[in-house]
Amino acid sequence: MFNKVTKTFQYGQHSVVLETGEMARQASGAVLVSVEDTVVLATVVAAKKAKAGQDFFPLTVDYIEKTYAAGRIPGGFFKREGKPSEKETLTSRLIDRPLRPLFPEGFYNDVQVVIHTLSVNPDIDPDIPAMIGASAALAISGIPFNGPIGAARVGYVDGQYVLNPTATQLKSSKMDLVVAGTENAVLMVESEAKQLSEEIMLGGVVFGHEQMQTAINAIHDLVRDAGKPDWDWQPAPKNEALIAAVSAAAQEGLNAAYQIREKQARTTKLREVYAAVQAAMAEQAAQAGQPAPDSVGVDNILFDLEARIVRSQILNGEPRIDGRDTRTVRPISIRLGVLPRAHGSALFTRGETQALVVATLGTKQDEQIIDALMGEYRDRFMLHYNMPPFATGETGRIGVPKRREIGHGRLAKRALLPLLPAPEDFQYTIRLVSEITESNGSSSMASVCGGSLAMMDAGVPTNDHVAGVAMGLILDSGKFAVLTDILGDEDHLGDMDFKVAGTETGITALQMDIKIQGITKEIMQVALAQAREGRLHILGKMRDALEGSRTELSAFAPRMLTIKINPEKIRDVIGKGGATIRALTEETGTQIDISDDGTIVIASVDETQAKEAQRRIVELTADVEVGQIYDGSVLRLLDFGAIVQVLPGRDGLLHISEIANYRIANINDVLKVGQPVRVKVIEADDKGRLRLSIKAIGGIEQQQSGTAEPAAQSEPQAE
């Protein structure tokens, strides 16, 4: 019934099993990947024909996590998985990026790659098994694909590279780098690091590429035993006559368009050229008595012609599209404190790319609780990236963030994360929002720069500025050029784009996408060195605008006071059914967070109210000391004395003989319920019962004359 084929290989400290032939047999390709209790099923299906008029490659990659993989039932009302989580979206992008360049040019059939996570070991992230599974499923499917690819995670612990570290090992690692590629070339890198040098980062890329050959070889073995016949697919023959006609009609106009330095004017000119060429081709066909050529085909020829013009200009040493040389960063403008009510804000403009980044400070209650498959955790730092269509002068949909926005936000977050102060040094929750108001390339790196400035403007004590720069590379016939601070057009027309973010000390985030083979380690070294030069230039501009974090928080940011109490006193602060803490927060307008170790954080925009809440908590939790004097209140009268409250929840007996320096016949003659009195604690027995005295501090007659001894002041243990 089943023709099951299995391949096993050792991959770092883990054993990996590839299986096919038992599950999802009607898919074009299906592979089950198991890595020590983490199990993923990768499937691929391709349409046999491209849709009519299709002018791009419609690849869809969906990475899907099921809660049963972790032995859990989904939360919420519906009890089934809903929209993709951020982790699912990011992993889908991670898998898509190295696969997409390996499909042949002109292949426009629908291809859908779906990866289901079926079982999860909390110590082994499913993303690397998912990438290997997707590669293997494509390799055995027979679909036109210039793979397979391998993928590896690289850590850096105690000065050594670690292949596929566990989640536990990553906590002590200075690097979390994912690299994917073929036998001969690296195609994709995604990394975060704790200010590591370019040499260490590149070493991690090379190490990962060397180690992934084991996975690639195992996939080749699987293909030999279980591969389906290759598709009989050939790209459509090139219409040389049409190419020549389009080139002749468009060359002059395109050359003129790429002499225009301003983006909007250049785009307008290009649209005019495209429209004129389409009209000319239709007219020529009509004169020849032939049908008009396919408009998609004409547009593709024009795009190729654009690419040749731009690439040849750069490789020949001519100015780039906007007139710069290969190493120059666009002009930078920085404005701080743009929004008067925001806690921190920065408007970062680099050429025609602009980001308005806003920092908001919150309390522990504002932390994001993430119910991840590998375990629930709280996130105190959020970065949300938004790019509305007006940023590129277009119309479009506004609503739920797209995959690209989620990916760019995650990259910027990775870049800033290593510079955040420790929670014990800065207890605020931090949310950054990057609103891209203009875009012509490198908007994610503008978000990094703006985010660093906005946090410093808000008074977040970050250790240093973080800057990011997007780089490009053009390689042709052995000649190459590395481009600093690329434009959007250079991104589309180049062979590699990579984004590097970091401080003067080192790199904090690296993202690399390579569209061709043949980019060597030496070329990457040159590119990273040039990126460092650009990053340091930007850091200099940022320091000129703001040397370091502001020492004062915004007047609109919550103020936090921290006190430490005996953990056994927590119940006194909370009260029965939460009544005490609820009354405290409502009456003072504060937020109060209580940790199990007795640490209490009080937050309020009004510092006076925060201090009032602090005073009341200190009173609630203070220990009564023998010999101390307290301002109390008479709770009730007895024949032989009175019960007096000295602190909230603590009262004692004031005997009639300890009230005055004379004999009192009737207690009602000197005290009333609710009367404030100053008392001294003269005794506390082993059960905590208190004996009080007014006579010991001069008697009731002194208090009535206004010459009583002052009461003790409770000192809060503020941190």
UniProtKB/Swiss-Prot annotation:
Domain of life: Bacteria
Described function: Involved in mRNA degradation. Catalyzes the phosphorolysis of single-stranded polyribonucleotides processively in the 3'- to 5'-direction.
UniProt xrefs under SMART domains: KH, S1
Name this protein carries in UniProt: Polyribonucleotide nucleotidyltransferase
Catalyzed reaction equations: RNA(n+1) + phosphate = RNA(n) + a ribonucleoside 5'-diphosphate
Positions annotated to bind Mg(2+): D491, D497
EC number: 2.7.7.8
Subcellular location(s) per record: Cytoplasm
Cellular component annotations (GO), alphabetically ordered: cytosol
Top EC class, one word: transferase
Residue span, KH domain: 558-617
Single GO BP term: mRNA catabolic process
GO molecular function: 3'-5'-RNA exonuclease activity; magnesium ion binding; polyribonucleotide nucleotidyltransferase activity; RNA binding
All copies of domain S1 motif, residue ranges: 627-695
Cofactor: Mg(2+)
Gene3D superfamilies for the chain: GHMP Kinase, N-terminal domain, K Homology domain, type 1, Nucleic acid-binding proteins
Provenance organism: Bordetella bronchiseptica (strain ATCC BAA-588 / NCTC 13252 / RB50) (Alcaligenes bronchisepticus)
Family the entry assigns: Belongs to the polyribonucleotide nucleotidyltransferase family.
Alphabetical keyword list: Cytoplasm, Magnesium, Metal-binding, Nucleotidyltransferase, RNA-binding, Transferase
